[in-house]
Amino acid sequence: MKQAVIVDCIRTPMGRSKAGVFRNVRAETLSAELMKGLLLRNPQLDPNTIEDVIWGCVQQTLEQGFNIARNASLLAGIPKTAGAVTVNRLCGSSMEAIHQAARAIMTGMGDTFIIGGVEHMGHVPMNHGVDFHPGLANNVAKASGMMGLTAEMLGKLHGITREQQDAFAVRSHQRAHAATVEGRFAKEIYGIEGHDANGALIKVLHDEVIRPETSMESLAALRPVFDPANGTVTAGTSSALSDGASAMLVMEESKARALGLPIRARIRSMAVAGCDAAIMGYGPVPATQKALARAGITVNDLDVIELNEAFAAQSLPCVKDLGLLDVVDEKINLNGGAIALGHPLGCSGARISTTLINLMEHKDATLGLATMCIGLGQGIATVFERV
């Protein structure tokens, strides 16, 4: 079976969704700039050999509709002979794009893919046009479509306190800020034009969403936002609303080597799994267990882990049940996570994978895991290996 590898991976800075730096930049533009960036950074690659562009996006309407993968690839000037498809596994969409490209390579259905994802949550909100079938209530709890309430449920089931959530959120902002100041995001961020508060055109080079001033005291002052009477989940312990895109060049290993392109990581194993929609945030646990089994390793073999921080109340139960509580500060989300950087839905899977690969290089690590929960009760996971 052929081997799929990551040759390159980049992302936009994460822009604040409310009046942020990308308020006048469309989702197709964010996507196209990254596609062009991958080609500029890897001139040995002939664009005419691209098999397919696979792009994750959740809200496929308005500027993100009518197959944004194709719209963005045409905008980027990718040869018209390349295919393009937009995929939707909700929060796991761009990780699903990684998996689809890897499976195609493994089965000989192409050797060069551009994958990634985007979500402009300022232009197309998460709940835009959502209309759940009334009959779903026969099979799942009514609140299962309300992500914040599923986090409340999962946190209660696992005894996660308000203070634990606040501490996890503070850690996310502190680590993301430190990564910015120390230049650890520089290799993964691809600068994109945006606009400052006065409307002037600027080159955006840093994430806009991080709040380095976040403290236990400031978070303690916030009221629960999803269950005001009895809840513990606040806006401060939830993933920030942000706009962004991420992209990867995924190739068959021998083809990449023949072109003299770098092999930044191999895709060692992949998995998806389902769980109860009422505790959708638990999905990373069964997905990770599957991926580890397929890789023939245990959780203790992992050097670095990126767990998407949809909510602190969701992340902590996953950390606990994966047996990782004692190694959080050594292995998990070392550059912060979505609480600080935001969770542009279709972007996040490739974004956390990009951050993971850069962290693995920084730490000279061998094995890494990227995993995330998915609305309505799923999880997705990928094990990467540096060679």
Curated annotation (Swiss-Prot):
<comment type="similarity">
    <text>Belongs to the thiolase-like superfamily. Thiolase family.</text>
</comment>
<dbReference type="Pfam" id="PF00108">
    <property type="entry name" value="Thiolase_N"/>
</dbReference>
<comment type="subunit">
    <text>Heterotetramer of two alpha chains (FadB) and two beta chains (FadA).</text>
</comment>
<dbReference type="GO" id="GO:0003988">
    <property type="term" value="F:acetyl-CoA C-acyltransferase activity"/>
</dbReference>
<keyword id="KW-0443">Lipid metabolism</keyword>
<comment type="pathway">
    <text>Lipid metabolism; fatty acid beta-oxidation.</text>
</comment>
<dbReference type="InterPro" id="IPR020610">
    <property type="entry name" value="Thiolase_AS"/>
</dbReference>
<dbReference type="Pfam" id="PF02803">
    <property type="entry name" value="Thiolase_C"/>
</dbReference>
<dbReference type="GO" id="GO:0006635">
    <property type="term" value="P:fatty acid beta-oxidation"/>
</dbReference>
<protein>
    <recommendedName>
        <fullName>3-ketoacyl-CoA thiolase</fullName>
        <ecNumber>2.3.1.16</ecNumber>
    </recommendedName>
</protein>
<keyword id="KW-0442">Lipid degradation</keyword>
<dbReference type="GO" id="GO:0005737">
    <property type="term" value="C:cytoplasm"/>
</dbReference>
<dbReference type="InterPro" id="IPR016039">
    <property type="entry name" value="Thiolase-like"/>
</dbReference>
<dbReference type="InterPro" id="IPR020617">
    <property type="entry name" value="Thiolase_C"/>
</dbReference>
<dbReference type="InterPro" id="IPR020615">
    <property type="entry name" value="Thiolase_acyl_enz_int_AS"/>
</dbReference>
<comment type="function">
    <text>Catalyzes the final step of fatty acid oxidation in which acetyl-CoA is released and the CoA ester of a fatty acid two carbons shorter is formed.</text>
</comment>
<dbReference type="InterPro" id="IPR002155">
    <property type="entry name" value="Thiolase"/>
</dbReference>
<dbReference type="InterPro" id="IPR012805">
    <property type="entry name" value="FadA"/>
</dbReference>
<dbReference type="InterPro" id="IPR050215">
    <property type="entry name" value="Thiolase-like_sf_Thiolase"/>
</dbReference>
<dbReference type="InterPro" id="IPR020613">
    <property type="entry name" value="Thiolase_CS"/>
</dbReference>
<dbReference type="InterPro" id="IPR020616">
    <property type="entry name" value="Thiolase_N"/>
</dbReference>
<feature type="active site" description="Proton acceptor">
    <location>
        <position position="373"/>
    </location>
</feature>
<feature type="active site" description="Proton acceptor">
    <location>
        <position position="343"/>
    </location>
</feature>
<keyword id="KW-0276">Fatty acid metabolism</keyword>
<dbReference type="GO" id="GO:0010124">
    <property type="term" value="P:phenylacetate catabolic process"/>
</dbReference>
<feature type="active site" description="Acyl-thioester intermediate">
    <location>
        <position position="91"/>
    </location>
</feature>
<keyword id="KW-0012">Acyltransferase</keyword>
<keyword id="KW-0963">Cytoplasm</keyword>
<keyword id="KW-0808">Transferase</keyword>
